Amino acid sequence: NDTRALPDFAKNVLDGNDIVLLSDGSPTRTFCYITDAVIGYYKVLINGIKGDYYNIGIDTPEISIKRLAEITIDHAKELFNYKGELVFGESSDVDYLTDNPNRRCPNITKAKNMIGYSPNIDVYDGVKRSLIWYSENYEEECEE
């Protein structure tokens, strides 16, 4: 339980547990696949202006955490015959949602224009790839 949505969802799936949201799932996010991020960081190193800053991420689609859970479940059913469901609960931590913004979406215009950054892997494919990776590396990750 590292409190990041996709890793927690993947753990729930691989353990055969329901995915539990500790909110209504309405906050929105964009989700950048790791290879796109690494390519972006590389482009900053090679093409970026020293001392300048660049937002690396993905700007579309912006989806709710609930939708991310639904996408995860859909892929998990296809890949692993997952039987779990999306359920809603509450955190015992009264401050759980205190610093949780309703929206996170980077403006990557500068990175696109100045260093040629262009993320390619959408959230649907990224979630599927991530679930496959987690399933292949699950035991090793649990040992750490």
Question: Could you say what each language-model-derived stretch is?
Answer:
Residues 11-144:
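C-terminal substrate-binding subdomain of Rossmann-fold SDR/epimerase-dehydratase oxidoreductases
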